[in-house]
Amino acid sequence: MPSPDGRLSHDLLPGEKGPRDACGVFGVWAPGEEVAKLTYFGLYALQHRGQESAGIAVGNGSQIVVCKDMGLVAQVFDEATLNSLRGHIAVGHCRYSTSGSSVWENAQPTFKSTSTGSIALAHNGNLVNAGELAAAVARLRGAAPAAPSISNPASSDTDLVTELLAGQPDRSMEAAALDVLPTLAGAFSFVFMDEETLYAARDPQGFRPLVLGRLERGWVVASETAALDIVGASLVREVEPGEFLAIDEHGLRTRRFAEARPAGCIFEYVYLARPDTTISGRSVHAARKEMGRTLAREAPVTADLVIPTPESGTPAAIGFAEESGTPYGQGLVKNSYVGRTFIQPSQTIRQLGIRLKLNPLRGVIEGKRLVVV
């Protein structure tokens, strides 16, 4: 494994910290396709979900290679790098941290080797029983101190899951997953792989979105339907809460590891998801527009102009204007070269980002009573 200055990684590093809550995950199983490039474009479509780091793991049936680094997807990967990642299966990740350092060591996918193979895992979510999982890893390490799958101590929720899945080399990955998944508490949408098979799982509440798509010669799993659109995959369905998927040369297999208790995060509709994404059969754009209409009915005001805070606020502002009969207009100019300010890792950076990102059209708004959505 090279130093953090390099890009290729074949193991976890000590000291990896921090849950990942609003990240983007993407996986593809497609023999004969350029899976690294499909994953690159899928992550590009999910870039809004995380801008700190990006990574892709590719398997060719005999080994897994992981490439990850700090930065945006287009900064981490170039044509030469993508051309070097050959295989029939891939998983990718773009990271936003809810806590912990924004450093190379925390980039995903995570990776672990075992005596029978390897696993690469990408996680969108935040587990709340990390202490229990750490104890399980410690017991596993104590029971098999020489096992090749147990090397560095795990220090984040994602690392712990990777350790637990990789720590049972005498069992199949499917069997290990169906044993581990019911022990997890919190939010998780996983996309992971061994050398031959693509796996996906979603927590029983379905906190974070996860969808299944079909290519002409394969399958895709992604955080949002917009990523399926970009790579030319057709939507099959959502991965159900409490469902586990396995995809290989024998096709698609599904198992339920927990009873579904749907409780999706409303912030996906409000901010996190792309407006051209569909969640639970409903357009995010339409949902935001209806939120604006509802706001106008429940909190009516007299105003001269309705303006959005671009981009997430635009559909809601349009809905408010249409419902209230108040004129709609642009009052804030967005700098398209500044990333999403809410998901920056510190409050100081967020405040600087807002000043860089938005500037008022003074001639439009000066002296007017405004509704800012």
Question: Model-found features: residue ranges?
Answer:
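Conserved short alpha-helical segments that host acidic/polar catalytic motifs at enzyme active sites
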Residues: 1-241, 246-303, 309
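Short, glycine/charge-rich flexible loops or terminal/linker lids adjacent to PRPP-binding catalytic cores
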Residues: 325-371
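Amphipathic alpha-helical
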Residues: 160-172, 310, 321-340
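Extended, hydrophobic alpha-helical segments in both membrane/secreted and soluble proteins
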Residues: 306, 313-320, 324, 328, ...
